[in-house]
Amino acid sequence: IRQAIVGSFDFERHSRISLGKYWKQRSKVEQEEFTGIMRDWTENRAIKKLMKRSDITTYDSEELLSSKALVKTTVRYKGTKTLVDYKMQITGGQWVIYDMVVDGASVALANRDAFYKKIKKTSYEELVRILKAKTLETN
């Protein structure tokens, strides 16, 4: 499952959504750096956490809306259920994931809320430093 998710994840779009209005304020180099950080963050924290807490994953349904899709799954772990939906779109002829919705909460929008608060309180540079440090902690 991890390979399927990582291999089909649109980290740039996820990063754009997560950074919101601050994305356009960043240079191309900063955008690429942030996308790399978000890739590491997603792989090392979110996906690892999901995989650790997953005994069985059930694919419940798909909703196709033109060039977008929503794939609904249920992850079971030690008797508890977590609903994980994958928001997907066609990019370059391939279906790619750009967001995960865990028990009704969008990961990208939750990131955006936290990132806006951090940038407003400190700075974009501090957000990047913290994300890098937290990603290194999990390796």
Predicted regions and their residues:
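Intrinsically disordered, low-complexity linear regions
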Residues: Q3-H14, T74-Y77, T91, E137
